[in-house]
Amino acid sequence: MNKQYQSRRWCWVYAIVCLLLFFPLPTQCAEPITPVLQVQSGKLTGLVLDPGSGLSVFRGIPYAAPPVGDLRWRPPRTPTTWEGVRACNQFSAIPWQRRTGTSKKSEDCLYLNVWTTAAGKEARLPVMVWIHGGGLNKGWGHIGKYDGSAFARQGVVLVSINYRLGPLGYLAHPALSAESDQGVSGNYGFLDQIASLEWVRKNIAAFGGDPDNVTIFGESAGGTSVAVLSVSPRARGLFHRAILQSPWMFGFTSSLAEPNTVALKRSTGSFSGAEELGSRWANKFVAGEGAAALTQLRKMSAQELVDAGSYDARVTVDGWLLPGRPVELFAQGKQADVPMMIGTTRNEGNYFIRYVGSKSRTEFEEKLNRFYGHAGGDVARLYPGDSAQELTGAGCLFCTDSWFLQPSRRMLQGMRHVKSAAYQYMFARPSKSYPKLGAPHAVELAYVFDTLNEKTASAQDRQLAQTMNRCWAQFARTGNPNAAGLPTWPAYTMEQRQYLVLDHEITQGARLRDKVCDVLDRASQDVYNKPPAGK
């Protein structure tokens, strides 16, 4: 019996040891919890990522009430309060969008995330609010490469946000305008962004941030968003610096109700305003345009709305949130008087290589003539080539220049009307994953956030990422990206037009494709400022 008892005892000991080895107790592996912070909606905690530096992250903080049910297609409302302590240790669901994958999607998506090393302290650190890209139709704020840890280690409080996308974020419709106190519709995603900035102003001090030193920055449609916020009277005073990375400003804007210019016909085949476009989309699955149709639309599930018909989200000039096209408002000096960084990548258009080719030289020139009218020939001469390969290259270069570089230059030149300085960059480091594409659209993101794969990135790439992350943080800190140990970055002026070339060897340049941009300036003025003949 004694031997049998001892045998059983050792079996139990062995089993317990195995359990501890393979299934450690939660307290042994869980990340430490931050101190309890108080925000306007209640108390919350986050996770401590690095106890030594105090680096912490707060995930999934609601900055507005869920825009569901009757709140669909309405301006965001104040977030509801909660009892007890909210554990902000999980990212929220991503906004509804047409994409495959396992990421949980929800209409209840108005959440933000905060990275900081000063939670609960009166540190008054500079704040940076990241607005993701994705054509206003896809994306979310907590993609891995947007991790804010590197910025936090630079002494910045980094905030990333989600906002409504696609038809849920940008649908303009006569019935929606009729029920609005301002008589407008569309742009709900931009209103979400403004609500997030209002939340930051009221609450970021609890995370060690300075509500009087807020930088907004974004890439692609996020850069477009920064441009919109920079000229919107609704966002004035909510930020103090702005960074526009590859802002997509080409043919991306429509008026609310009035017939639009050739820019809209290019993508829609009509001169209709945003409301009419929204009505056509809604009429695919709901009859009528009045309040009854709106009731039916609000009863549809988010998935039905996103999947039932393709809605091309766009910026709507509504006269309330957005009084005009951002590029033209910059040119008139009507933007916020805050320091700005504006830049592009060397080969933006190569990202869109599948969409910009032409079967023949004639077809390529016809496309330009349809958009630019009598100026199409001048534009076509900028992009020679006859073979399929040459025409693809011409299309990619045209995309780089007209979609990104020329509008960016217009905004940079518009900064001469205000007191604040502007800085231009051009990211030139080729993509390691797709070297044949050069430095395409969005390639700079992992460098800005310093989130390159440490196992595969070269020492030179890691150094470039660290330098860019420091430049961005320094700009957020002071409004000037120059500091000891950083490359000399001259401000953009109409006389010199200098910019920084971001590559393994960081250099300065001047007058980036100025002659090409001059031609595109003249051509685009004809497009955007004159309605088509007979309309």
Language model features with spans:
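Substrate-access "cap/lid" subdomains that shape
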Residues: 202, 227-228, 236, 245-369, ...
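Non-catalytic accessory segments of hydrolases
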Residues: 29-187, 211, 454, 458-468, ...
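Alpha/beta-hydrolase active-site loop
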Residues: 109, 182-205, 270-276
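Glycine-rich nucleophile elbow surrounding the catalytic serine of serine-hydrolase chemistry
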Residues: 218-228
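Bacterial N-terminal signal peptides
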Residues: 13-24
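Mobile gating loops/cap/lid regions near enzyme active sites that modulate substrate access
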Residues: 50, 354, 406-535
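Alpha/beta-hydrolase-fold catalytic nucleophile elbow
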Residues: 162, 217, 232, 243-246, ...
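Alpha/beta-hydrolase fold nucleophile elbow
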Residues: 207-219
